[in-house]
Amino acid sequence: MAARLLVRSQLDHVEAGGILDDCGPSSSACASSWVLGKEITAAEGIAAKEKATGFKEKQGVSDNGSSLWDLIKTCKVLGANARYPRDWDDCVASLKKGAALIINVDAAKNYPPQAISAWHKRYIGRHAGATYGHMTAAAWCDDHGLQFADPTFSGKGKEKFAVTVTDKELKAIASSKGDAPFKRCIIVKK
């Protein structure tokens, strides 16, 4: 597969009271779009999570952060399949077979410079040194290698596509919560 991973931005949705919602369903839309080869918007991801979990999120309130299990169910509603990996090697091998990952991170801890969005740079300006629980996506192709998509990217201009990262950088990002990197991932496939 020779394609670039399109970001599904959570920024098009409500940010209220200092809370930016919808990273999980936006990342589910990104990963599912990749493996299914079709356009799935962040809004469709949000609707799929509501259908999968039965919970309608109140925007601007930290009331429904996504779990990886929620996102496995969300991907199923979107038409993809998702599972927990056996280990990090399973994550990498699956990526190289056309799967995508959803990765639960402590943003933007361990991010390389190219993976930090303009939104996050502004956020850090207001909250120096702060990190936050966050869902992201990753994929791999022959032409671009590993690609990392943070839904705080705008999805426009230079933030339209995921950024290229090395194997070491992706593993560091996935390790940002302090445990084994595969424990914070799900593998999304057809």
Question: Where does each model-flagged region fall?
Answer:
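Surface-exposed ligand/attachment interfaces on beta-rich extracellular proteins
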Residues: 87-95
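Mid-length scaffold segments of soluble, non-membrane domains
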Residues: 71-86
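Structural recognition of the beta-strand scaffold that forms the well-ordered cores
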Residues: 83-84, 101-105, 137, 147-149
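Sec/Tat-exported extracytoplasmic proteins
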Residues: 27, 31, 35-36, 75-79, ...
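Loop/turn elements at helix/coil->beta-strand transitions in domains of secreted/extracellular proteins
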Residues: 78-81, 97-101, 144
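Active-site-adjacent structural segments surrounding the nucleophilic cysteine of cysteine proteases
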Residues: 1-65, 116, 129, 156-162, ...
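Solvent-exposed loop/turn segments at secondary-structure junctions
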Residues: 18-21, 30, 88-89, 107-111, ...
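Noncatalytic regulatory segments and standalone regulatory/sensor domains
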Residues: 1, 111-132, 137-190
